[in-house]
């Protein structure tokens, strides 16, 4: 029997947003192969739910599960998981092997995984070798930074994500080796660059897109090694 005869495209209503979405015949074949039921959430809502699993930006005050003192954490205070200060988590004061459990092949894997997850200590956030940068997560070797995440070796930076070796800047996303920048994404090796995207080695410029080696340029795109350009003219 051809797959098209066995499986049909089906339109379902998302249980979350109530919008219709289509499950293709090829999808049904895949679900049957791996023995899982068809989805009840549309792709967009499923994507949001997967994103919700990993939190790097929202920070909370919550009690340390060991000491009871308030710590800064990426985990909401209402979660059942045990959270401890990162210094304790990295120390030799506890043995991770103490939390090991035998796997029961007669029970559902995810039920056992959740039980294990709810008993082992998690570090409240990851922020090693930080100086005056308490409100940062996955931000290694930061100095005088505030609310940055997924970052490395930054100084005096705020409200940024996925940045490397940045100084005196804020509101950046995926920017490297730059200083005095604001509202830039996917840029690197720039100085005093503002409101720009996908630029390299640009200086004293505003509102650029896909520019390289530009100085004192404004509202332009696709420039290479140009100076004093306004709207690509």
Locations of regions flagged by a protein language model:
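Long, distal/terminal scaffolding or interaction modules
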Residues: 1-233
